[in-house]
Amino acid sequence: IGITENGDYRSCGFHEGYRIGNVKDKKLRTAWEELQKSPLHLKLRDKSNIKGRCGVCEYSEICGGCRTRAEYYTGDLFESDPACNYIPKVLREDPKYLERMREELYKK
């Protein structure tokens, strides 16, 4: 949970949307409990909703990528984090994926 300069609670301190109240109207504990029960937060916590590389990554349960960055750059909160350069093991072992990456890397 993040608290902005004007006292708004947000699900992430970097995300402009998803306001869940303000310190003037709501205690932090109440905001936290409401966030834990919100449909969006429950969907975000279910790692099976995460797409792309982050969705198949062996570290998804402890990382999952930055959802705010994913939404900012891709328009989709559940897409892979574009700033992560890690290639999950399942993709490193996929010859088709490796060939696509080679083609992208060396295209002229």
Residue ranges and their predicted role:
Residues 3-4:
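Short, acidic, Ser/Thr-enriched surface-loop or helix-capping motifs
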Residues 8-10, 14-64:
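C-terminal accessory region of radical SAM enzymes
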Residues 9, 14, 78, 105-106:
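Phenylalanine-focused residue identity feature
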Residues 22-23, 73, 100:
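Sparse recognition of residues in long alpha-helices and their boundaries
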Residues 31-34, 41-43, 85-89, 96-99:
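Short C-terminal domain-edge/linker segments immediately following a structured domain
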Residues 48-97:
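Cysteine-cluster motifs in flexible loop/terminal segments that predominantly coordinate metals
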Residues 93-108:
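Iron-sulfur (Fe-S) cluster-binding modules
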